[in-house]
Structure formats: structure tokens, C-alpha cells
A protein has these predicted regions:
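Charged docking surfaces used in two-component/phosphorelay signaling
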Residues: 69, 164-371
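N-terminal Rossmann-like NAD(P) cofactor-binding subdomain of oxidoreductases
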Residues: 1-217, 257-261, 328-329, 333-338, ...
């Protein structure tokens, strides 16, 4: 039976992955070994039904005993350990949530509902590096799967509304702390029916600008505000997160030599774990709205078409409605006044499920069946 090693399984993405693997009874398909960077020798989790101890995640010999390693430990760990492991002669499969290896020539960005053919072709050629994609990219691709498969898209402008979870667990905690801080400072005024809303607004504004406001992780207030920049500055006016939209999409689809133009701005908002995207799409030809909706809704089992109506859009197209779900709703689809080939759409997806853990879980199942 194949031996699979897990690193970073206690973190945010790793924890969601473990939960999904238990729900789908994945652990019965292989022998599991759990690694740790800080608690070597402690009891390992009981997910696989057998008791063991945690192995050292920096021990190349222990890692090399695995047929497959799945890491959610982050880019620094990958950059340190992966080359050492390959240099030791290890020929196993490396699955990774981090972005470090995504754009390497010998790496496949995994999203099997869209690129299963590319995955199978790479496997037959001996590829052994399988990397999870950027969260907003994966969610957008799944939502627009049908349009991509029929090669109907000329270009996309994507304006994102990204949750705190994309920045990490400590950022999620800080967002809640910021929310609590704002409320605590304004509570007396909120409870006073005679208090002016302008007084409450001034109180909130003052709190957000206070030197004591918790911003260690975000650097600026997110609660009651937003952050119009995500990831590194590429020194060309574009953030790295925005660059990923085009670069990773075209690699996932195998279109590096014939890329679809994808541009836009990435913005952090005060949601916890679901990313939203407002899309402007230019199609290659004028097709009916009915055909567009049918193409989108029938593409895969996770996309959920929401009628472009006020009440159901408000109910179904929000982070509050989608958190914890594998379904990816897409709505607000209509023809734009710019011309018959232009359409709008709005989509929401759980950043920790299809945006992170689920592609990793599924490629592991694919490899286990193939090896």
C-alpha cells in the first residue's frame, strides 16, 4: 500500500483538508504518516485508524520513505526541504498547497474538473509535482468552466473581494479583534437611542485611526474598511495577486502559448473565508443569454447558477451563504450595454475548500489510483 506523508496538516488549509478526507473516507486508501516541524515524537492524529507518533518534517530520510508527500506547511518549508529531498534521489510525488513551485516547468497546477486531461498527460510523461492553484483563480475557473471548455472567452476583467482567510489564520483572528474593538468603543452610543448616528460614526472613525487599533497583521484596518492591495508590488502598478489571475489561469488550461487575457484588481474585504469576484467578460461571439446560462450551469456538479433577481441574489450570492460549502454559486449574469458580446457575472466560493484543500484531496486520490 502506498505511503503518504502529511506536513502542515494542523494549519488552516491542512485542517480543512483533514476534515474533507475523513468525510470522503480517503485514509483507508493508503498508509498515513504525519510529520511535524515542532512536535516530533508526540502522538499523531488517529485519522487513519492506527496510532503512531509524529515524524520530524525536516528529516530527509524519513520523508524519502514516502511514495507521496502532501504539504500545507507553506512556501518557506517547500523552498527549504523540497530541493534537498529531490537531491537525495527521492522519486516520489510532491503535492503542495504553497505557491513556490506553481510556475516551474515540471509542475502542474491542479484543478482536475478543468484540466484532468493535462494531469493525465503529465503523469504519463513522468511528472511528479502537483501544485494547488491560487484560490481566486481556481474559484473563477470552476464558476466559468463551461465557457472556458467551449473556448468562448476572449478576455475577462476580474475585480475580487477577498476574505481574510486568504491572508492566514492570524489575519482572521485580527479581523475579529478589529470588529470587537470597534463595537466595544461604540457600545454605549449604540445602546443609547438618543445618540446621533453621526456621533456613532465619528466614534467608529476615531477608533479605526487609533494608535491602539490592532493592525499587526494587516498593517491597516480591515473591519469597517477594505485593503485595495494584496500580495507583493511587482513595480509595474500590478500586485502579484493580480498577476496570478492571468499567469495561473493559462497554465492550468495549458494555454501558455495562446493565453486568454485576464486583468483586474484584487481587494481584501472584511469577510472571513469566502472570496467573491465581479466579472466583466467579453465573449468571442454573440450568443443568447439562455445558452450562456445553460453552458455555465451544466459544466460541473459544483457550479450553481443563481437567477439574476434581487432577492435570490442577496440570499445566495454572499460569503455568509457559501461558507463551508463546496458549491460555487454564480449569478448577476446579463448582457452589458457595451455590446452583445459583453456579459457580467458575480461569483462566490469558499477559499478553504475549492480554493485550497479540495484540489489537493482530489489529486491525491487520482495518484493513489494511478500508482
Amino acid at each position: 500500500m502506498n505511503r503518504v506523508g502529511f506536513v502542515g496538516w494542523r494549519g488552516m488549509v491542512g485542517s480543512v483538508l483533514m476534515q474533507r478526507m475523513q468525510e470522503e473516507h480517503d485514509f483507508k486508501e493508503f498508509d498515513s504518516t504525519f510529520f511535524s516541524t515542532s512536535q516530533t515524537g508526540n502522538a499523531a492524529p488517529f485519522f487513519s485508524g492506527s496510532q503512531s507518533t509524529l515524524k520530524d518534517a525536516h528529516d530527509i530520510k524519513e520523508l524519502a520513505a514516502m511514495n507521496i508527500i502532501l504539504s500545507c506547511q507553506g512556501g518557506d518549508y517547500t523552498s527549504d526541504i523540497y530541493p534537498k529531498l529531490r537531491d537525495s534521489g527521492w522519486q516520489g510525488h510532491w503535492i503542495d498547497a504553497a505557491s513556490s513551485l506553481r510556475m516551474e516547468k515540471d509542475a502542474v497546477i491542479i484543478l482536475d474538473p478543468l484540466n484532468s486531461d493535462l494531469i493525465q498527460e503529465a503523469y504519463k510523461k513522468g511528472n511528479k509535482n502537483w501544485i494547488g492553484g491560487n484560490c481566486t483563480v481556481s474559484l473563477m475557473l470552476l464558476a466559468l468552466d463551461g465557457l472556458f471548455k467551449k473556448d468562448l472567452i476572449e478576455w475577462i476583467s476580474s475585480m475580487t473581494y477577498q476574505a481574510a482567510s486568504g491572508a492566514g489564520a492570524q489575519n482572521m483572528r485580527e479581523l475579529i479583534s478589529q470588529m470587537g474593538n470597534v463595537y466595544n468603543h461604540a457600545k454605549d452610543l449604540i445602546d443609547d437611542p438618543k445618540a446621533s448616528i453621526l456621533d456613532i460614526d465619528r466614534n467608529v472613525s476615531s477608533t479605526l485611526k487609533s494608535q491602539d487599533f490592532p493592525i499587526d497583521n494587516f498593517g491597516v484596518p480591515l473591519a469597517g474598511s477594505l485593503i485595495p492591495w494584496i500580495d507583493k508590488d511587482l513595480n509595474n502598478g500590478q500586485s502579484k495577486e493580480e498577476w496570478k489571475g492571468s499567469a495561473e489561469t493559462n497554465k492550468i488550461l495549458g494555454r501558455e502559448n495562446n493565453p486568454i487575457v485576464i486583468e483586474g484588481l484584487c481587494v481584501r474585504i472584511g469577510a472571513m473565508r469566502c472570496h467573491s469576484q465581479a466579472l466583466t467578460i467579453k465573449l468571442k461571439k454573440n450568443i443568447s443569454l439562455e445558452e450562456i446560462n445553460q453552458t455555465i450551469s451544466s459544466a460541473n456538479q459544483w457550479v450553481k447558477l443563481i437567477p439574476n433577481e434581487r432577492e435570490i441574489s442577496m440570499k445566495e450570492l454572499s460569503p455568509a451563504a457559501v461558507t463551508g460549502k463546496l458549491s460555487i454559486p454564480i449569478g448577476r449574469i446579463r448582457k452589458l450595454n457595451m455590446g452583445p458580446e459583453y456579459i457580467s457575472a458575480f461569483t462566490v466560493g469558499d477559499q478553504l475548500l475549492w480554493g485550497a484543500a479540495e484540489p489537493l484531496r482530489r489529486i491525491l486520490r487520482i495518484l493513489i489510483k494511478s500508482i
